[in-house]
Structure formats: structure tokens, C-alpha cells
Amino acid sequence: PGYDAMFSAAAETNQAISCLVNADGLPEIDRMCSVHPNVTVVIDHLGRIGIDGVIRDSDVDMLCSLAKHEKVHVKGSAFYALGKDKPGHSDLVPLIRRVYDAYGPDRLMWASDAPPSLAVETYEDQISLIRDRISFLSEMDRDKIMRDTAARVVFFQ
């Protein structure tokens, strides 16, 4: 009942809900989005897929399946805590590609997760994966992911 009240309030007040959940919480997000299709939802930190060091296809499948809900967005952030958690984060590129293919750049946004992230890596480590090193992203995609999507979704521009 608590989630239903939260989603109902978000629908009534035109607020976005930002969800910090692990992959096992994604089915509940799916259920709530089915009941409340007009609520804007942002899944933080790629659904924390790989938080234990393992990126499971079933978790990625579940995150990608949420793209059927037009108002669901995904934040690519906390790279330092996902997968092999090494700066460079190249092990996350296949995950990011699948999420990109499911959602497109208009429903993806980057975030640093600072200040916690700054305890383990530099800001450059955090930003460079999306900004510089993912070859399938166009400049327009990067602009959307790095700036435009968040501006539109979070600030309702």
C-alpha cells in the first residue's frame, strides 16, 4: 500500500519518482508503472545491476523490459560500484548498450553519484565512459544522455 500511495501522489502532483532499487525490486516498479502509467519514473544506477560484481542477463532483461512503460527512464550512474568497479568501466559497456537499445538516448541520463563516488575515483573516471569511450553513441546521443534528458525529466522543461 505504501508504494501505491506514493505513485498516486506523484500522479496527482506531476512529480517524478526516482527509484534506488536493486534488480530484485524491478518487478515491483513494473507493477506500479502498470497501475500508474502516467507517473514519470527514473531508475537510479542502472537498477544497481552488477552491485555484487556479476552482471546477470536476467537482471538486464528485467530492466530493459521496463522500457515498455513510456515514462520510465534510467540513470547511468554509480559506475564505480557496479561490475568489476574499476575505473574505465569497460565491463559495463554491454549493459549500457542493452539499456540504450531498449530506452534510447531520450530516456537515459548520466549522473556522477558524487560525493560517494569521489571517495573511490575521480570525476574524470566517472564522466569519461559516456562522454568519450562508448563508440556507439553519437554526439547527439551524448548530449541527450549527459544533459538534455535530465533537464527535461527532472526539471520538466
Report residues per predicted region.
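Mid-to-C-terminal alpha-helical segments outside catalytic/metal-binding sites
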Residues: 98, 102-109, 118-157
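Catalytic pocket-lining loop regions of alpha/beta-barrel enzymes
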Residues: 1-109
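Short, active-site-adjacent cap segments at secondary-structure transitions
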Residues: 81, 116-118
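Active-site glycine-centered loops adjacent to acidic/histidine catalytic or metal-binding residues
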Residues: 113
